[in-house]
């Protein structure tokens, strides 16, 4: 079985509430799960103790059994100090795109033309 530790949505429309569950990855998002590991209520303030609750011991058990976490649950576990922070490396993100380079070149050309015109006068 491909196990995942993920969020299962509950609550009503515009009032989300999530359960942190260990589930087979092939099961529906809100469907059958193996064990409930905690809860997440995004409507509460970020500094609230009740916002994220989880059974850390059981989470560590499922991680030791080979369960993979989703991105959002991994961030919650990092914040709780259960797992180490994963390094995210995307060196191309800071490189400007084609259009940005073209705009910068046009701006530099206009600035150079303006300084030449000012120097001639």
From Swiss-Prot:
Gene3D superfamilies: 3.30.1320.10. Residues 84-121 are annotated as: Disordered. One of its GO terms (biological process) is translation. Pfam families: Ribosomal_S16. This is Small ribosomal subunit protein bS16. The keyword Cytoplasm does not apply. Belongs to the bacterial ribosomal protein bS16 family. SUPFAM superfamilies: Ribosomal protein S16. One of its GO terms (cellular component) is cytoplasm. GO terms for molecular function: structural constituent of ribosome. It comes from the Bacteria. Keywords: Ribonucleoprotein, Ribosomal protein. Residues 110-121 have a biased composition (Low complexity).
